[in-house]
Amino acid sequence: MLDERIYESYIGILKEEMVPAMGCTEPIALAYGAARAREVLGKEPEHITAKCSGNIIKNVRCVIIPNSGGLTGIEAGVVLGAVAGNASLNMEVLSNVNEFERKRCRELLDKKICKVELLDSPVVLHFIIEMQAGDDTVSLEIKYDHINVTKIVKNQEVLLDSDHKSGETPAAADRTLLNLEDIKTFADTVEIDDVKEIIENQIRSNMAIAHEGMTGKYGLGIDRIIRETYSNDMLTKMRSLTAAASEARMGGCDMPVVINSGSGNQGIACSVPLIVYAREMELPDYVLYRALVFSNLLTVYQKQYIGKLSAFCGAVSASCAAGAGITYMGGGELSVIKKTIENTLANIPGIICDGAKISCAAKIAASLDAAFLAHHLAMNGQSYAPYTGILKEEAGETISCVGQIGKEGMKETDKEILRIMLERV
């Protein structure tokens, strides 16, 4: 059995990370910040400046904002949040936008009331919303996490100043306690009632948007191409449904997703493949619940090293966790699960992140292909030897090394990606 402190921390991590969000999380974060700033200002702004870190710019430029009528971009997310956002709904801030508010948003965008500036900051998730109406001004800063407001200033008066020097959002749950052994033990032994509501919400929400993606017209429709091109096997079903959910989300669908590590695509990628597998294999609900607990915690564990935003695509981490979760459901011992992780990371330790957009679905499909191959290799007793490339003696060490590459080694790559993306702007 796990120590009570670890058990409660793991429950806390799941509650903090697995929350519903509507739309891609970075534009939603901007909308939330703008909605909060508008509340403080107390009136519709006449001028707005959005100062955004490079990773925020990268992840907002190309993705369709939900309930916007097809709008994309930082200005649209900020102005819609200011006009129609309900900050009390957190990551579902834009869930109640009406047609009048959409029209007003377009009018203000036509007037170009919002300008965007690059914020030179070492914090990858960092932006400041500045608003002005008449003689009143407001500045609101969000850092480290999508709705973590660290500073509010109105008319030169500081209303809030709670910057967290650790570089992490303060949380009740201690993420430093995460490790593969304890994650496996926790998944094996957790009281189902302690996680049932969170897990069932993830199953319900993420599968609903997956089916919406299959029937609606979003992106390139790669789910259909996958189904028509490949045999109707388990992998095809997993890849097509997961890609469909991602395309719907990136394509502006207003249905909520239960996210992981601040990302809807990661929440989708670490859950939908397991749900498909469990249903195809007719496994009991409790087996799926425990596997989803394992997969979600493994995703968080990997992202602790990489960071919420980086030059690495988070779909790889989540797909790696999905592959390991399938091994878990298939009865694989911890040693076999570790082989699945190592096999995945030996194949695709990282795909570059060039922003949130509809092609994220293709990256998820490719990552799941690698993860499912890794699963089958591991279940057949095959794995790459330690020190094959970046692999270490233990899977946990390899995860740490991949995180180090993504967080530190790829900093200059991230800057170059942003430079290339902004060339035509």
Model segments located where?
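Conserved phosphate/anionic-ligand binding catalytic regions in large, soluble enzymes, centered on
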Residues: P20-R36, M255-V272, C313-A318
